[in-house]
Amino acid sequence: MKRTILWSLVAAGSILLNSCNKWLDLQPQDGITRAEFWKTKEDVHAALIGIYSSLNSGPVEQQLFTWGELRADLVGLTSYATDDNRLVKNYNILSTNVIADWSAIYTAINNCNLLIDYAGQAKQADPTFTEAEYNTDLGEALAVRSFLYFYLVRTFRDIPLKLKGTSKDTDIVSVGQSTGDEVLKQIEKDLLQALDWIPEYHVNTSGYNATNAGRVTRPAVRAMLADVYLWLEQYDKVEEQTAKILETGRYSLIGAALPEIFDGGTMETIWELSHKNSSENPMYNIGVTARRPFTANVDILNNEIFPSNEGTDIDLFDSRGEGILYGMSGDLRKYGTESPDYYNFQLYRFSDVMLMRAEALAELGRGTEALALLEDLRTKRKAIRATDPNIEATDLEGIILFVFAERARELTFEGKRWFDLLRLAKKDNYANINVLVDLVTKVVDANVRQSAINKVRDVDSHYLPILETELFKDKQLKQNPFYLK
């Protein structure tokens, strides 16, 4: 009986997901109408399953990866890469490039909006739907929506901010555009609300639990808030949120056995997308198969991120460098070991929180505490002396650069590198713009390098264009001015 109920919920969630797959142009497919759905708490739970299913869909997960990696330095291209991929890598992005396709992300956002809009209707109709269950479902939908908007705002800056769902023809409206600052304020507001509604954990257990790792928990919301506050350069709030995660005592580093993190089952995971029991891993085709478009940038990884050790430790290796490459093939095999199609995509894990906290502490003048966190992480990962800058606690800028170097080692191929480099570059009103100039110098083909350097000095170029087809659909959308030149 339990199996039947579970599959019914999954099926209903799938129908909901598919019924709204044209959100941004606001053309609903009227699969499940308001009158037919939203009558019981099971309907709301099914909608929540649909939300998480939309995150695991190929287009969403692949866009999270490409937005966070393709313009950076750790992922390169193979001969199977598309022309659009090559244009992105050479910083010659057009408004027709598929990297600017946000439709799958907005479909997932619409699923969140529908739950937020109509869960109250189910609560009124179903007396068994408790206030706690209702708040939890709403909180998770708010948190997932915020997570997706945070990716969008860092990728495009000024975007449509849709807070109401589209489920029928009369819902069709032109939503226009909100500034990046407005979007970030909404994200913060929603995450703080979710923090009140979402429980600490969904399953009360001291060890790893797939439900706790696969659904948004209160620590996951705190990790998102810390990430948002880093982007906003509000370091006292980063310190506050990361401290509360550490205070749970629940999370810990497992040491050098990195494949275990991505294979599932460790207490490093705060929030993940699980593919443990499915061979339909959307990352497999773009990073591992023979005709994959993306490859590890082996030269930069081996020479800059994971250089060889020196002196008496010449035979020692950073466990993180050993874990991300399959020999010299360039496969993106961080996500799994012998069977890379069964990886878990880590959205937030404990080491990420430690590094966010270390950065905030350094920005707040607490260099000794920041270095202690870095030392703890490096010791567990068996980091080598060649990557230890031997910084004093008073060298706060040096510590911050050390943190970013450790983020490159720790979070390789996790969809975060471009956003890290952009965040470092734009800090203090773009005081570090040369971070991006140096990046372009390393990754862009020589024949177009100077042109790319000139482009990257324009801060508008750091955000993707609105796809041309979206501009045709909604006349209120305005193109990023860089792409009008």
Predicted region positions:
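Short, surface-exposed recognition loops and adjoining beta-strand edges that mediate ligand/DNA contacts
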Residues: 35, 61-82, 162-164, 171, ...
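Structural register within alpha-helical repeat arrays
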Residues: 138, 145, 152, 218, ...
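Membrane-proximal, proline-rich intrinsically disordered regions
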Residues: 20-68, 91-94, 242, 256-261, ...
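Conserved, well-structured interaction surfaces
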Residues: 45-46, 53-54, 59, 81-156, ...
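Bacterial Sec-dependent N-terminal signal peptides
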Residues: 1-28
